[in-house]
Amino acid sequence: MRKELLKKVKRVVVKIGSGVLTGENGGVDPGFLDGLAAQVAELSGQGTEVVIVSSGAVAAGRQALGLPDRPRTLPQKQAAAAVGQSRLMRAYEEAFSSYDLKVAQILLTRDDLANRRRFQNARGTLDTLLACGIIPVINENDTVVVDELKFGDNDNLSALVTNLVEAQLLLIMTDIDGLYTADPRTDPNATLIHQVGAVTRELERGAGGSGTSVGTGGMATKLAAAKKVVKSGVAAIIFAGRGERTLSRVMKGELLGTLFLPAGESLNRRKHWIAFTIKPAGSIVVDAGARDVLARHGRSLLPSGIAQVEGRFDRGACVRVLDPDGVEFARGITDYSSQEVEKIRGHQSSEIERILGFRYGDDVIHRDNLVLL
């Protein structure tokens, strides 16, 4: 199954974590980048387009600034990223030019992808670069981003980029062999899971833990990234990036790492964007009946099923949809503001115009703008 799935891949996103990219001195490892460039050149020669999501700017800046530990505050991280990003790209250029490959730097914030027009513009730019045979190297724009606009980590960014460029595969290179039944660093009985058909709550609980001294993402963030892409019908593989030509071997179907199979019913690109790219501005709590109608029958959310409104949001904002226990089970684009929803909640759609003095439609969230999680 793995080999057959990988044969169909024509565009792949490769996420490279700081723990893989950096050497013992904490800076970018030129030997690793040379090996990576050789493997990317091999894939490109076979007709596979490669997009790289690379960490490492903060780590490179930390080395240049002589900082003993990873920066903790946002200003420190931004200063380190400002110093390190140019060094990171220079290292990529030097390594890839040896194989006649050109690279392009793309720096993104969450706001770039949350805005649909900018999302589409970014897609057009990346498509053009790939058509020209150029390897995009994408990173979060750490020098200007604020906490509320952060992707959180590059694992999450790689999942969003996979949707952005419509890749058929996400590869996450990390410092361990893949997803284990337990933490292999503390449990000698932990075994590698070679294939995952569905990301369950049990798997998510077992993947806890934070990042390393040079990176922000632990296995939990990688599992979350895999969960995002499989929902749009894309496979993901988490594997050790420091082994011998592991990228090439994975792409040839060798049994390395953990393969996450695509979901049977996949989200279209727009619904994936709603579910995972836009940051929710608030929440709507629905009653048990409304939850059942939405979850089982794929209907629109009507005001009659709304029990509570949390937060302030405008018409057209993304909101979480919570069940009576406060558990999020859906997200959607609302046709009414929080103040308007507060006034019409619990009422029939036929009463909207009488209550508000106007009416955008019968639905608070139309089913075309609603995504079950």
Swiss-Prot record:
Reactions that this protein is recorded to catalyse: L-glutamate + ATP = L-glutamyl 5-phosphate + ADP
Segments traversing the membrane: none
Extent of the signal sequence: none
EC number: 2.7.2.11
UniProt name for this protein: Glutamate 5-kinase
HAMAP family: ProB
Primary localisation category: cytoplasm
Natural source organism: Geobacter sp. (strain M21)
Binding locations of ATP: K15, T174, D175, T216, G217, G218, M219, A220, T221, K222
PROSITE patterns: GLUTAMATE_5_KINASE, PUA
SMART domains associated with the record: PUA
Secreted keyword on record: no
Any one GO molecular function term: ATP binding
Places the protein is found: Cytoplasm
Organism classification: Bacteria, Pseudomonadati, Thermodesulfobacteriota, Desulfuromonadia, Geobacterales
UniProt record similarity statement: Belongs to the glutamate 5-kinase family.
Positions that bind substrate: S55, D142, N154
Entry keywords, A to Z: Amino-acid biosynthesis, ATP-binding, Cytoplasm, Kinase, Nucleotide-binding, Proline biosynthesis, Transferase
InterPro entries linked to this entry: AceGlu_kinase-like_sf, Asp/Glu/Uridylate_kinase, G5K_ProB, Glu/AcGlu_kinase, Glu_5kinase, Glu_5kinase/COase_Synthase, Glutamate_5-kinase_CS, PUA
